[in-house]
């Protein structure tokens, strides 16, 4: 039984990284990896996390295409006292605190992915710098890495 995604057996203290090509297959690969290594609290928690992950990877791929970046996107999983999944890309990023850069029209074709991801994983973090962007998706309250 998972109680609030807290580890009862102590931290597992391991991590790994998967490089994902800028291809739609990367979304399926990432989702499969997470499903295989994570025990979710419920089917709804799994669905919510996977929707957020899909949006984050899709945004990273869009940014790489827009900026003509050939390097892969990185999916990292850290398993310690709190389990975290991270997606890193080499794009310019998006300032989640700058409301003026978000589209005003909810029917706009882009700009909603990270907001949707945050709706499903409220503790999501975004760090952008001149060398890229990393989005962290904590599993707290959703599941644990096995």
Indicate where each model-derived feature is located:
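Conserved beta-strand-loop-beta-strand hairpin that lines the nucleotide-binding pocket
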Residues: 1-17, 61-146
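Conserved ATP-binding N-box helix of the HATPase_c
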Residues: 44-71
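Bergerat-fold GHKL ATPase/HATPase_c domain
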Residues: 1-51
């Amino acid at each position: 039984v998972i109680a609030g995604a807290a580890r009862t057996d102590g931290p597992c203290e391991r991590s790994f990284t998967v490089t994902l090509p800028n291809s739609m297959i990367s979304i399926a690969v990432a989702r499969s990896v997470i499903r295989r290594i994570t025990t979710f609290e419920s089917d709804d928690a799994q669905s919510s996390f996977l929707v957020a992950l899909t949006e984050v990877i899709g945004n990273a791929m869009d940014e790489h295409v827009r900026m003509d970046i050939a390097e892969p996107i990185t999916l990292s999983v850290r398993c310690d006292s709190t389990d975290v999944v991270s997606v890193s890309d080499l794009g310019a990023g998006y300032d989640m605190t700058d409301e003026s850069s978000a589209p005003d029209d909810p029917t706009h074709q882009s700009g909603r992915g990270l907001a949707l991801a945050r709706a499903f994983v409220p503790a999501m973090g975004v760090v952008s710098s001149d060398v890229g962007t990393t989005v962290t998706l904590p599993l707290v309250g959703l599941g644990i890495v096995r």
